[in-house]
Amino acid sequence: MAVLLLGEVTNGALNRDATAKAVAAVKALGDVTVLCAGASAKAAAEEAAKIAGVAKVLVAEDALYGHRLAEPTAALIVGLAGDYSHIAAPATTDAKNVMPRVAALLDVMVLSDVSAILDADTFERPIYAGNAIQVVKSKDAKKVFTIRTASFDAAGEGGTAPVTETAAAADPGLSSWVADEVAESDRPELTSARRVVSGGRGLGSKESFAIIEELADKLGAAVGASRAAVDSGYAPNDWQVGQTGKVVAPELYVAVGISGAIQHLAGMKDSKVIVAINKDEEAPIFQIADYGLVGDLFSVVPELTGKL
């Protein structure tokens, strides 16, 4: 058996955390080949080659892959699929766009958010907002799946995998790049951050979210938000943590003004230490918190920030 793993490449750089955790998840299935695709992907490929457990790295450099369009990447993967029994990717926003297309082109099912691999055909994935674990046995000749990287520790350094160039696939011509609107931030990326401070609807306004950002900056943390806060317009969509947002498992997760709806808990319950700040002592978030503080967040959070 052999595994083709799509590396997460953004602006020519490898998302090492997501890729290394995915390598750790699949390495027991057989030799792991990491595919790095982008307009500039050689540096990312060299980085992927250093990850322990990687047997080979393929690099596809072409302007076609420069704007993260799903259709060209899916076509590239399908063209390489013949040599592999398993095709996987970390469950990032990009991969969730690409992998279902790969599965459709191969006429197999896609397994999303795999949290454990029991054997070559059997996988576990969370369902019902993380309240149950589904065991899935696939009879497809090729398994296509995304990996819930929060469930795995990252593979270490020390790899010396060879890097080989591969030709770009033909452009399917189904979509074209128009423009990128990128928000610049000095904060760590949400899904790989060691610390996360998230705010909920209890903040009351977009302006009040500034106190969350100030605390996060003092902690060197990423900023997250509940779905309720995002839906209310208090925070941008890419900050959303939860079942329909991003899944995180940092060393420290601080939930401020978040009640603890099941949808939110599904995205952060694997955090190592959870701190909850809420004025409602009956809030469900306190049931999973390691540390809880009942109080007015508008008093407590600025005081905490001031003491850091």
UniProtKB/Swiss-Prot annotation:
Q: Which InterPro entries match?
A: DHS-like_NAD/FAD-binding_dom (IPR029035), ETF_a/b_N (IPR014730), ETF_a/FixB (IPR001308), ETF_alpha_N (IPR033947), ETF_asu_C (IPR014731), ETF_asu_C_CS (IPR018206), Rossmann-like_a/b/a_fold (IPR014729)
Recorded hits in Pfam families, A to Z, give: ETF, ETF_alpha
Concerning SUPFAM superfamilies, the annotation shows: Adenine nucleotide alpha hydrolases-like (SSF52402), DHS-like NAD/FAD-binding domain (SSF52467)
CDD domains named in the record: ETF_alpha (cd01715)
Q: Which UniProt keywords apply?
A: Electron transport, FAD, Flavoprotein, Transport
Recall the GO molecular function terms of this protein's record. electron transfer activity; flavin adenine dinucleotide binding
**How many cofactor units bind, and how?**
Binds 1 FAD per dimer.
UniProt-annotated binding residues for FAD: 252-280
Cofactor requirement: FAD
Q: Which GO terms describe its biological process?
A: fatty acid beta-oxidation using acyl-CoA dehydrogenase
Q: Which family does it belong to?
A: Belongs to the ETF alpha-subunit/FixB family.
Q: Subunit info?
A: Heterodimer of an alpha and a beta subunit.
Q: What does this protein do?
A: The electron transfer flavoprotein serves as a specific electron acceptor for other dehydrogenases. It transfers the electrons to the main respiratory chain via ETF-ubiquinone oxidoreductase (ETF dehydrogenase).
Q: What is this protein called?
A: Electron transfer flavoprotein subunit alpha
Question: Which species is this UniProt entry from?
Answer: Paracoccus denitrificans
